[in-house]
C-alpha cells in the first residue's frame, strides 16, 4: 500500500534490511520514514534511481558533439573511440537491434573512421547478471556484432572491426540494483594500432593500455 503513492519506486527486502530506489529523492525519503515508523527494527536504505531516458539522450548528445568537434583531417583513433564511449546504446531486453537514436552517432563515427588508416576497433558487448550466463554472453556478442555490422554498412572496412561478447563478466556496477544493471549493459570500444599492436581501452574519462 505504501508504494501506491510512490510511482517508479522499487522496494527490496532482504533479511532485516529494506532497500528503496526511485527517481524522486524526497519521495523516497518520505517513504523510508513511514516504513521506519512501522518497522523500527529493520534497517531502511534509500538510493535515488537513474532516469534512463534522460541518461541515454544526454549521452547521445554528448557523443554527437564530441564527434562533430573533431577535425576530419587530423582525427586520431583514440578521439573517435572516446567519443563513441560517451554514448549509451540502450538495447531493448533480449534484442540486438540498434536503437534508431544511436545511429546518428555511429554514422558520424563511420565517416571519421574511413579517414584513419592502420587501425582496428574492437566492439565489446556486456550484459547485466540477469538470466543464464551463456545466453548473456551470446546476446552480448550479437549486440557488439550489430554495432560492427552497422559501421560496415556505412562504409567502414570490415578488417578494421572486431566484435567480442563478454556477457556478464567485468561488471562496472552493482548487479543487485536497477541502476547497476543499467550501467553494466553496455558497449565499449577498444582501439588497436595495427602498426604497433598496442591495444588501448578507451572510456569517456581515460585511455588505458591493455597490452
Predicted regions and their residues:
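A broad, low-specificity signal for short, low-complexity segments enriched in glycine/proline
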Residues: 81-84, 122, 148-153
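Periplasmic OmpA-like peptidoglycan-binding domain that tethers envelope proteins to the cell wall
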Residues: 96-104, 126-211
